[in-house]
UniProtKB/Swiss-Prot annotation:
Biological processes annotated in GO: membrane fusion involved in viral entry into host cell; symbiont entry into host cell
Pfam families named in the record: Pox_A21
Purpose of the protein: Envelope protein part of the entry-fusion complex responsible for the virus membrane fusion with host cell membrane during virus entry.
Keyword Membrane: yes
Posttranslational mods: Contains two intramolecular disulfide bonds. They are created by the viral disulfide bond formation pathway, a poxvirus-specific pathway that operates on the cytoplasmic side of the MV membranes.
Record-given protein name: Virion membrane protein A21 homolog
GO cellular component: membrane; viral envelope; virion membrane
Species per Swiss-Prot/TrEMBL record: Fowlpox virus (strain NVSL) (FPV)
Lineage of the organism: Viruses, Varidnaviria, Bamfordvirae, Nucleocytoviricota, Pokkesviricetes
Cellular compartment(s): Virion membrane
Length: 113
């Protein structure tokens, strides 16, 4: 009986504390993303000499940046002219590109501050 009580308390904790915090986080991210899209649309923006874009997923906002297909180096703002040689990388995939972590940091800073 005591174990059943602990299980019930656990679910009450999850649904009353944790779930509302996650929902609030997603609401704030969606508001920031909506404001960004109203101002800039779906275009890549030059932030810190890198081309950045954002997408909204069920898990929140993801920053995307462009890299060269061949060299895997981040594209600079002037590379937008050669769009066929570029691929988009999300900051979630950026673990492969540890040296480029500051690009993602700057992108999220621009969106939320």
């Amino acid at each position: 009986m005591f174990v059943l009580f602990l299980i019930v308390c656990y679910f009450i904790l999850i649904f009353n504390i944790i779930v509302p915090k996650i929902a609030d986080k997603l609401r704030l991210e969606h508001e920031a993303f909506t404001k960004y899209r109203q101002i800039y649309g779906n275009k890549f923006r030059c932030i810190g000499d890198n081309l950045i874009n954002y997408s909204f997923t069920p898990f929140g906002v993801k920053a995307n940046y462009l890299v060269n297909k061949n060299t895997k180096m981040p594209a600079i703002c002037n590379d937008i002219k050669n769009i066929n040689s570029l691929i988009a990388v999300t900051c979630d995939d950026a673990s492969k590109f540890i040296k480029h972590r500051n690009i993602c940091e700057r992108a999220y800073t621009e969106l939320f501050l």
